């Protein structure tokens, strides 16, 4: 609180005591409650859903422990908590479009999302392998060094040399199904996925062949 120190008003008048400022009432905004992750609750929700709230289990598509057995559905195991939460929130607010996922998250609370993400982060990722030996060199070049002449930066700069990503910043890519990674790069390029300006910018510079090569290479990272 500011304090006004009184003095002489003028040399021509007698000194008068300074008037104290009227007390100011301040109302502090309530501090938002800190949400703590409950991985056990996330486990239950992931594997069983919550029929009373219309929440379907995740395991049916994303597999036991987040290791999807189908290339069109992403592996979620060992993914960074903050990244998973962001994607779920983006589906719910429409920033990221996917009719199936938007329906799945419609009744999830912020607590549900954090619990699911915390559970998945603790699961062991089943590693994959690169399938196309003819494109390994190109994929490795793009991932490690980028393509300078096209303005494509190295993927490793953000997603780390082994594809583990950086918690709270960039997702894990190692071991992910190549088909899924390709589909996301195409979505960024075509504008059907818009929740990363950085990735949209990079993807617009990539050809189909480059996307396939780097996606296959990332599938084998460990």
Label the model's feature ranges.
Residues 15-17, 69-75, 91-131, 167-172, ...:
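Axial heme c-ligation environment in periplasmic c-type cytochrome domains
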Residues 30-32, 37-93:
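The feature marks the first
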Residues 55-64, 116, 152-161, 214:
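The canonical Cys-X-X-Cys-His
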């Amino acid at each position: 609180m500011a304090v006004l120190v009184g003095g002489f008003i003028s040399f021509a008048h007698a000194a008068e005591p300074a008037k104290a400022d009227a007390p100011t009432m301040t109302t502090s905004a309530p501090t938002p409650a800190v949400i703590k992750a409950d991985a056990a609750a996330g486990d239950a929700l992931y594997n069983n859903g919550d029929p009373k709230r219309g929440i379907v289990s995740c395991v049916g598509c994303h597999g036991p422990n987040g290791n999807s057995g189908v290339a069109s559905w992403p592996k979620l195991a060992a993914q960074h908590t903050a990244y998973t939460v962001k994607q779920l929130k983006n589906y719910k607010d429409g920033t990221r479009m996917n009719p199936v996922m938007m329906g799945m998250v419609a009744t999830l609370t912020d607590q549900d999302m954090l619990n699911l993400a915390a559970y998945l982060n603790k699961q062991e990722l089943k590693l994959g392998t690169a399938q196309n030996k003819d494109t390994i060199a190109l994929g490795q070049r793009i991932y490690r060094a980028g393509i300078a002449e096209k303005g494509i930066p190295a993927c490793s700069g953000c997603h780390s040399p082994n594809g583990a990503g950086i918690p709270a910043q960039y997702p894990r890519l190692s071991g992910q199904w190549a088909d899924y990674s390709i589909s996301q790069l195409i979505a960024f390029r075509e504008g059907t996925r818009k929740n990363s300006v950085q990735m949209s910018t990079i993807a617009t510079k990539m050809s189909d062949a480059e996307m396939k090569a780097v996606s296959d290479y990332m599938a084998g990272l460990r």
